[in-house]
């Protein structure tokens, strides 16, 4: 290499040293000083890993004094370069000797890095390009926000999320029956709103007892890190902001906290995009006097654009309560209860017409008349003829029915604000089989009860009932630690025998109290060595996760999981199908919650419910009231809490004093009321609303598309390569799972989201659903998103040099592969990414400037290439410089033309889609007042905004690869 004092060079291996100056030449050695870091380096002249820095006309360079010039001419004098050009601020002609260049130079542009010898490994170029393609694919996916959550692909849940999550500021009531997954629906909507940029600040308001359950659910299922706010947290947050709610973007708090005027005022001032209210049916309202809780939520709903209310089914609550929820969503629309009742009468005609269409049977004359009147603004005669014409094939007739149903749906009074699924309308639930196992009351319990009565015992009726239902607690209270109830309780003997006879089965056991659960685990372990684990409210989230994972493990895992009532809230174990109720809760909703741990959509087997109970006791009476009065073991009972409230006094009395005749009378009354309520609910079912809520064939198609994405092996390969390049340690742990650990040789100092102690992940949704301790990896997972960001926001893979061994081409032939990014920068909330996300544009040039990218795919080209070491690569670049400069200019011409085509296509697609949606909503507004003016105005503004962003689209070179043909 020809060196001369004062020349500027850069180190190929230590680019962070900045620009070096030759300060010494002695024999075979050359010494460089790097002023930016105040360090010197000595190199062998013949093979120094150095690259001469010479800029080209058009480059903007900076002097060590801080001013810049645009190079127009280069002069070489005594082996040193002088740059002539125009001062960027004054416009004067100036010159700059290379010795006076800024020392802190960084080569950010790929072409500058290439010519400066900062050449990356071949595989990193590939990972960078694949990362850009992956980001583009995700941004343009019509399933964005639905694939990432660790939830089962349940059609009605995904459908509601798809429909609601894509709206601007959705205001919706989610009122599915228990067990159908309202929390999951809300989580999917939240996840989608965040990923699509429609929402950034979210407030979830829940009952105090459910705060941590929601926190865990949002993190475990949706990878969303919410913060729980209570009074202490608010006080702590004052150090960072006057308004504590501004210190976090995603917040969970209780309604109790917001009852305080100070906290409510702060929440009202916190600029939320979306508010979610769980258990909204507890907000009491009357026209004369709304409750304080209702007024709190009402105040927030007036300032927060998006509102999701999670509530029990309207049938369970009565019309006035239902109207109160709708009023929170749209007070202008639902302004008067009496007017709402009148309007509901008109819904019945719509629902009847929908029933007739959905039945698939011949339409009666009154249905035809109703349809014609309801859809009077368009001619539906051709569709009606098709439906009635038996010579037409079934597919065409079904299509006609479907189109008319859609027309009715669009006109349905609450179809856009209310989603309500019932078990009657959703398929996929298992059969529930109830098995009662009577046991003899032990003498020890009888003695304890007698002693308690003699000592005065409990006087409160409810306390007496609890004592009668849990004799083991009364016994243990007398005996303290001197004896253990589980050593003689026949229910424990039955449980041990049952587990021994079903060794291959996973069994979930639920008891009311944590103490009972711990005692049962001790009994199983000490008496028979049965592998069981406990799950109760005293355990941390991590401890519960470990217990759940131990139970879920197929080989070597626990046979039984013993849960307390509170500890099992929000956890589901569909992989088990045997449920043992060691005792019974004094609440039908809690009983349903217990059974719901196994009786979920996705349960592959019948659910066997086992109840060992003490015969001729309060336990038997309560079992009979649930089973014979409500059929609560084998069917869900949405009216259970209504019946419990009606008959609670009689029931509690009979549980304590046990009069056979009076109890039989109570059972008869309960059965009659149960049948009457069930019939009323069945008659009140709104089939049209159900069709809208579960999505039918469209929902099925949606989950099929999601399932197909889960099977994308290309994604798995890309993610594994991404982690390889970054330097993440990957260890196969069997069962389709991988353990990821940070390594000492990672490319980046930190990898946000990757814990120091590692994380177990899987690409298999079923595996992730069965194991709470395993993360589901999709392209939406934060670990994937962060990995892509680390690569694409750094200089990794921006330059590469490779050799193409192909004797059909002359040796020394060059190809220049250029990857540009076409980017119309815009806020994520604008939704521009749906039409024009940052898009990779590939150009492959031969030495004559011909673009071969249409004929030579990236994959086929990449397979033929071999890597070269950095030093040789730098020499090859220097030897090809004169050929490369005009090729870069030519490449930009091709990329500009491609970008113009992309923006035109995006503009056409955007205009077409938004105009169609706007026209549809404007037409609907004439027949359905639930279309809000804000939605229409938002669409109009969005079209103008997006057009402006597309006009400002920019092109930037992202990566470059030089390829030389070799025959060696």
From Swiss-Prot:
Q: Which residues bind ATP?
A: 176-183
Any one GO molecular-function label of the UniProt entry: hydrolase activity, acting on acid anhydrides
By its UniProt entry, which PROSITE patterns does this protein fall under? HELICASE_ATP_BIND_1, HELICASE_CTER
The Helicase C-terminal domain sits at: 491-645
Question: Residue ranges of the Helicase ATP-binding domain?
Answer: 163-332
Subunit and partners: Interacts with the RNAP. Has a higher affinity for the core RNAP than for the holoenzyme. Its ATPase activity is stimulated by binding to RNAP.
HAMAP family, per this entry? Helicase_RapA
The Swiss-Prot or TrEMBL record describes its family as follows: Belongs to the SNF2/RAD54 helicase family. RapA subfamily.
Q: What is this protein called?
A: RNA polymerase-associated protein RapA
Gene this chain is encoded by:
rapA
């Amino acid at each position: 290499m020809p060196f001369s004092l004062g020349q500027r060079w850069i180190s190929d291996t230590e680019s962070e040293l900045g620009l070096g100056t030759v300060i010494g030449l002695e024999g075979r050695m050359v010494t460089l000083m790097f002023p930016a870091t105040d360090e010197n380096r000595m190199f062998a002249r013949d093979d120094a890993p150095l690259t001469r820095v010479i800029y080209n006309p058009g480059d903007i360079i900076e002097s060590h004094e801080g001013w810049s010039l645009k190079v127009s001419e280069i002069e070489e004098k005594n082996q040193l370069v002088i740059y002539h050009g125009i001062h960027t601020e004054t416009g004067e002609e100036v010159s700059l000797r290379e010795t006076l260049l800024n020392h802190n130079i960084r080569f950010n542009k790929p072409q500058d890095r290439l010519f400066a010898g900062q050449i990356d490994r071949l595989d990193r170029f590939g990972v960078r390009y694949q990362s850009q393609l992956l980001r583009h694919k995700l941004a343009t996916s019509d399933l964005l926000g639905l694939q990432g959550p660790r939830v089962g692909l349940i059609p009605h849940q995904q459908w509601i999320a798809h429909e609601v999550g894509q709206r601007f500021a959705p205001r919706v009531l989610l009122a599915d029956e228990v067990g159908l997954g309202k929390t999951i629906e809300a989580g999917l909507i939240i996840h989608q709103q965040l990923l699509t940029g429609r929402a950034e600040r979210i407030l979830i308001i829940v009952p105090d007892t459910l705060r941590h359950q929601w926190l865990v659910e949002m993190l475990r299922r949706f990878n969303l890190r919410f913060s729980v706010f209570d009074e202490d947290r608010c006080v702590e947050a004052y150090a960072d902001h006057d308004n504590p709610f501004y210190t976090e973007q995603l917040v969970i708090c209780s309604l109790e906290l917001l009852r305080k005027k100070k906290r409510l005022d702060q929440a009202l001032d916190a600029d939320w995009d979306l508010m979610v209210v769980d258990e909204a049916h507890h907000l009491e309202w009357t026209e004369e006097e709304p409750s304080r809780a209702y007024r709190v939520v009402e105040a927030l709903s007036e300032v927060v654009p998006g509102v999701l209310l999670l509530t029990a089914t309207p049938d369970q609550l009565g019309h006035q309560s239902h109207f109160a929820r709708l009023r929170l969503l749209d007070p202008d629309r639902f302004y008067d209860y009496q007017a709402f009742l009148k309007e509901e009468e008109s819904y019945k005609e719509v629902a009847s017409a929908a029933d007739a269409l959905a039945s698939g049977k011949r339409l009666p004359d009154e249905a035809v008349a109703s349809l014609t009147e309801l859809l009077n603004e368009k001619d539906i005669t051709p569709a009606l003829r098709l439906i009635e014409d038996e010579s037409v094939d079934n597919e065409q007739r079904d299509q006609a029915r479907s189109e008319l149903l859609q027309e009715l749906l669009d006109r349905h009074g609450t179809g856009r604000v209310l989603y309500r699924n019932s078990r009657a309308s959703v398929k996929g639930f298992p059969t529930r089989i109830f098995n009662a196992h009577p046991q003899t009351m032990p003498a020890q319990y009888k003695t304890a009860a007698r002693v308690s009565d003699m000592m005065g015992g409990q006087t409160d009726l409810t306390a007496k009932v609890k004592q009668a239902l849990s004799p083991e607690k009364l016994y243990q209270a007398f005996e303290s630690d001197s004896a253990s109830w589980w050593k003689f309780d026949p229910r424990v003997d039955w449980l041990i025998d049952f587990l021994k006879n079903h060794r291959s089965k996973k069994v979930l056991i639920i008891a009311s109290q944590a103490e009972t659960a711990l005692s049962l685990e001790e009994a199983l372990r000490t008496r028979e060595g049965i592998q069981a684990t406990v799950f109760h409210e005293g355990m941390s989230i991590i401890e519960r996760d470990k217990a759940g994972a131990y139970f879920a493990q197929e080989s070597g895992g626990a046979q039984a999981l013993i849960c307390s009532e509170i500890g099992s809230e929000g956890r589901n174990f569909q992989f088990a199908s045997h449920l043992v109720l060691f005792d019974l809760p004094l609440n039908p909703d809690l009983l349903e919650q217990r059974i719901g741990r196994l009786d979920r959509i996705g349960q592959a087997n019948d659910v066997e419910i086992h109840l060992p109970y003490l015969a001729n006791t309060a336990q038997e009476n309560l079992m009979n009231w649930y089973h014979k009065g409500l059929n609560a073991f084998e069917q869900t009972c949405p009216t259970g809490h209504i019946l419990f409230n009606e008959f609670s006094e009689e029931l509690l009395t009979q549980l304590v004093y046990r009069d056979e005749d009076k109890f039989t009378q109570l059972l008869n009354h309960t059965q009659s009321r149960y049948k009457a309520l069930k019939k009323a609910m069945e008659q009140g079912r709104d089939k049209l609303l159900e069709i809208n809520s579960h999505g039918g064939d469209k929902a099925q198609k949606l989950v099929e598309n999601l399932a197909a994405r889960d099977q994308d092996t290309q994604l798995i390969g890309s993610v594994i390569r991404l982690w390889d390049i970054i330097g993440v340690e990957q260890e196969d742990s069997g069962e389709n799972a991988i353990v990821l650990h940070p390594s000492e040789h990672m490319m980046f100092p930190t990898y946000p989201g990757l814990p120091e102690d590692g994380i177990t992940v899987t690409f298999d949704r079923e595996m992730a659903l069965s194991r709470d301790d395993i993360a589901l990896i999709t392209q939406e997972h934060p670990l994937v998103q962060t990995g892509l960001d680390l690569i694409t926001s750094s200089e990794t893979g921006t330059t590469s040099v490779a050799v193409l061994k192909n004797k059909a081409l002359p040796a020394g032939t060059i190809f220049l592969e250029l990857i540009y990014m076409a980017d119309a920068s815009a806020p994520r909330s604008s939704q521009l990414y749906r039409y024009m996300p940052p898009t990779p544009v590939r150009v492959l040039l031969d030495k004559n400037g011909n673009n071969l990218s249409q004929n030579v795919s990236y994959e086929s080209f990449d397979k033929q290439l071999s890597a070269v070491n950095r030093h040789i690569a730098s020499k090859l670049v220097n030897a090809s410089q004169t050929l490369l400069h005009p090729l870069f200019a030519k490449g930009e011409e091709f990329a500009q033309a491609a970008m113009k085509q992309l923006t035109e296509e995006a503009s056409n697609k955007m205009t077409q889609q938004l105009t169609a949606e706007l026209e549809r909503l404007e037409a609907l507004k004439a027949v359905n007042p639930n279309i809000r003016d804000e939605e229409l105005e938002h669409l109009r503004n969005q079209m103008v905004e997006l057009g402006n962003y597309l006009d400002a689209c920019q092109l930037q070179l992202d990566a470059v690869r030089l390829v030389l043909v070799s025959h060696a």
